């Protein structure tokens, strides 16, 4: 299966875009969609055979592999429904996140879809979204007497490589976090969590939803600091210049899923406070 999207595929999806425009301009009376909002396959000239290769790493609860070996998570469920409505097949590929751009450049994947922060990266990719929001927060070991960002002075903190927290902390742009003794950039969140458990580091930073799930399994050992490191918009990233109509179509589908409550319902199914998750608070 190819990671790139062919010219023929783009032509197929252009047909879909035309149908979407009709729907958005009030022309849905022509019965172009079914009752679930799915674009009819007969209008797409076989579009259902087209796949979208989605790259992400293991980042629970957004994207992860369950005990049966299946791809699951908030982003996975959103992607499955969005692709269903577009009439295409999602193919999930686990990647090394700090090599994400090389996967895009080599056409091994079509897009990055894994709690990926748009903020500060709007010119780097072709985006669909935002489709939800996130807070970047700091988790600390309770035995290290860290109760605020100021207490991170002289402490060891870990971040995921190429993440927004890595940039913020290494650049020193946040005046609230100064004088940390060391910053460790790790390839995966699993490595980060293991280092926290073993006490190799004092604190770490990441998406609140993922961090909270980890803390809930270890409430006696860890705390989440009250301060917010960064508020971000999450989106789906495509390489610029490659079938740019697809992000536009996906963007419209994601808006529909926000408006009809689908994304909120998916978030709630993972025990998430959906009002905050959707940016309502």
PLM features: what roles do these ranges have?
Residues 23-26:
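C-terminal motif of bacterial Sec signal peptides marking the signal peptidase cleavage site
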Residues 80, 84, 89-151, 223, ...:
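Acidic, polar ligand-binding/catalytic clefts
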Residues 53, 57-60, 71-84, 116, ...:
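Bilobed "Venus flytrap"/periplasmic-binding protein-like clamshell domains
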Residues 102, 115-124, 168-171, 195-231:
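A ligand-binding cleft/hinge motif common to bilobed small-molecule-binding domains
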Residues 28-30, 76-85, 146, 150-151, ...:
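Extended ligand-binding regions for polar small-molecule ligands
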Residues 29-41, 89, 164-186, 223-225, ...:
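Ligand-binding clefts/hinges and TM-proximal coupling segments of bilobed small-molecule sensing domains
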Residues 56-58, 133-140, 208, 212-255, ...:
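Periplasmic-binding protein-like
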Residues 34-115, 185, 269:
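Extracytoplasmic small-molecule ligand-binding "clamshell" domains
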């Amino acid at each position: 299966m190819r990671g790139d999207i062919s010219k023929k595929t783009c032509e197929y999806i252009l047909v879909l875009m035309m149908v979407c425009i009709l729907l958005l301009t009030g022309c849905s009376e022509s019965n172009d969609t079914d009752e679930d909002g799915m674009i009819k396959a007969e209008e797409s000239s076989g579009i259902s055979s087209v796949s979208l290769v989605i790259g992400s790493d293991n980042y629970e609860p957004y994207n992860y592999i369950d005990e049966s070996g299946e791809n699951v998570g908030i982003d996975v469920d959103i992607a499955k429904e969005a692709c269903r409505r577009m009439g295409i097949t999602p193919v999930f590929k686990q990647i090394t996140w700090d090599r994400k751009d090389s996967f895009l450049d080599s056409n091994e994947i079509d897009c990055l879809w894994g709690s990926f922060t748009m903020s500060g990266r709007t010119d780097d990719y072709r985006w669909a979204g935002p489709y939800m929001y996130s807070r970047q927060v700091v988790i600390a070991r309770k035995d290290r007497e860290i109760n605020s960002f100021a207490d991170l002075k002289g402490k060891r903190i870990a971040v995921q490589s190429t993440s927004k927290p890595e940039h913020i902390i290494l650049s020193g742009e946040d005046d609230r976090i100064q004088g940390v003794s060391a910053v460790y950039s790790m390839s995966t969140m699993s490595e980060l969590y293991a280092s926290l458990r073993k006490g190799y580091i004092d604190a770490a930073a990441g998406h609140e939803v993922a961090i909270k799930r980890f803390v809930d399994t270890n409430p006696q050992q860890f705390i989440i600091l009250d301060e917010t490191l960064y508020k971000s918009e999450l989106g789906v990233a495509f390489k610029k210049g490659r079938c740019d109509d697809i992000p536009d179509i996906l963007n419209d589908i994601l808006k529909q899923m926000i408006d009809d409550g689908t994304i909120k319902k998916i978030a709630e199914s993972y025990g998430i406070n959906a009002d905050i998750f959707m940016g309502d608070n």
